[in-house]
Amino acid sequence: MQKSLIAVIADRYRQQDFDALTSKDDLKPADIRRICFDLGIALIISVLFQKVIFVAMVFLLRGFVNAGLDTGSTLFTVLNYTFSNISTYLPKILAFGAVYLKYRPLRRLDTQYENKSYYPLIFIPAMFAFAMWGSNITTCINYILQLLFGVGEIENVMDAIAPSSFSSGIVTLIFTAFVAPVFEEMIYRHLLLRSLKPIGDTPAIILSALIFGLAHGNFDQFAYAFLSGVIFGLMAVRYDSIIPGMVLHLINNFFVTVITYQKQLTGIGGLWDGLVNAAAALGNIIVNISYFAAPFVAVLLAVSYTHLTLPTKA
């Protein structure tokens, strides 16, 4: 019986011995193509699997509604976000995790830096600055498309998914500011970027950021997600850890969510409203300062990145 194409490809890859590699210089173009091919297949599988899980979750949620669950209730909002996060992150964790485990022997080829003297605070304005400039790029492209082709205005995704009540606003804040950064850094900067690092740090950062931007699934968020992904990738490579990027990602999502949904997150009065308003004000200050500091921060990051101190061989 003739083997299927998938079985033939699987057999071919099982025969590859990466344990013999001692440095990145040992990787041949065919090896790099093979790694990228595997990641491409993993990406396709994760997208298809995501659609299947999403449809299943929709039917499950519809079953709860038919059973009497109010679509305006907090429980519905919690279930909606939970199911959405499961369908979004689970397929990518499984697909990219499989590639990560397969090429785990290549992890010892990762560049280890002796000098970790990056100034951590410059990443905060860099994060907000790149996000703001990414939004400006989207606005400019939208204007050009409207001018040349008469297309409609690109929908603001944050407005489209805006919570309708205080309770749903709290759920949105929890999932957007705390859940999403953890899973996204695990997927894109740990599983994906680490799998790509054998082909070079810079290509790994750019490709992982590109996939991170595309994974948002809409044009409105692509530019700033891509630029933000570059910052998170720089941090993951520079510190050999996803924790700093995860913290910065959390800070960014927290302030963006509070600023965007300030109205929905307030209204109960007292200390809570004061804290939310203060956080929104602080976020606006950081965003405005970062916006004008963007060119200087970009230059500082570029200079720092090109002066990495590599360990010398004995």
Spell out what each predicted region is:
Residues 133, 158-218, 222, 227:
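Function-critical hydrophobic alpha-helical transmembrane segments in multi-pass membrane proteins
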Residues 92-98, 291-305:
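Hydrophobic core of alpha-helical transmembrane segments in multi-pass integral membrane proteins
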Residues 306-312:
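Conserved small/polar residues in nucleotide/adenosyl-binding loops
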Residues 46-102:
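Alpha-helical transmembrane segments in multi-pass membrane proteins
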Residues 2, 63-79, 112-180, 197:
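Juxtamembrane helix-loop-helix connectors linking adjacent transmembrane helices
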Residues 1-36:
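N-terminal juxtamembrane cytosolic/stromal segments of multi-pass membrane proteins
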Residues 68-84, 159-167, 268-292:
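Membrane-interface segments at the starts/ends of alpha-helical transmembrane spans
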Residues 51-52, 214, 221-287:
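Functionally important transmembrane alpha-helices
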